[in-house]
């Protein structure tokens, strides 16, 4: 099946986000607060294309065909699982996706890079505005039939790393309280 997808150069869907247990635990351990998730947008530009090109195939987001919505959904899942999500919370997390790319062209290694600006507001006042980024590498192959499915499979791990860097920032967690 993967070989057929690769050879036809068609469009594939990124896997739905699966929350990181470590990220959820970090949110649980970060104190008493609740937050809601606002809109995430995407700033078009080099290194932030939609869909993502993978050796002639293209990968789309399962969330309204938007990778900004992918990051938004990821934060919603992790806040919900940590019992920190509340639709009427004062603190609102929103953001802008600045960079989002996978490279499956390497002979033995695939890479991914993602960068986003995260904003926390309370009653219209910005309490946090920072750019976070993540880089992820995985074993790959020269053979497209191996490299492309592997890159697709690794995308959620890239987003998990981005959110881990956000949750590791004490200023972000403090802004939520």
Task: Locate the predicted segments by residue.
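Short alpha-helical linear motifs
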Residues: 42-44, 114-119, 154-159
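Sec-dependent bacterial lipoprotein signal peptides
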Residues: 1-10
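Mid-chain, structured segments of secreted extracytoplasmic proteins
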Residues: 62-88, 95
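Surface-exposed short loop/turn segments
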Residues: 11-22, 81-129, 133-149
């Amino acid at each position: 099946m993967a070989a057929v997808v690769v050879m036809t150069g068609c469009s594939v869907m990124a896997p739905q986000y699966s929350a990181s247990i470590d990220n959820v635990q970090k949110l649980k351990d970060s104190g008493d607060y609740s937050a809601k998730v606002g809109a995430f947008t995407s700033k078009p530009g080099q290194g932030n294309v939609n869909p993502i090109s993978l050796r002639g195939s293209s990968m789309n987001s399962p969330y309204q065909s938007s990778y900004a919505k992918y990051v938004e959904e990821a934060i919603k899942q992790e806040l919900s699982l940590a019992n920190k999500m509340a639709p009427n919370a004062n603190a609102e997390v929103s953001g802008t996706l600045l960079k989002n790319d996978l490279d499956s062209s390497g002979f033995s290694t695939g890479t991914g890079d993602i960068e986003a600006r995260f904003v926390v507001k309370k009653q219209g006042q910005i309490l946090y505005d920072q750019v976070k980024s993540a880089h992820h590498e995985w074993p790959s192959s020269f053979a497209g039939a191996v490299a492309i499915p592997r890159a697709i499979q690794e995308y959620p791990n890239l987003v998990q790393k981005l959110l881990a860097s956000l949750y590791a920032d004490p200023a972000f967690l403090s802004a939520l309280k």
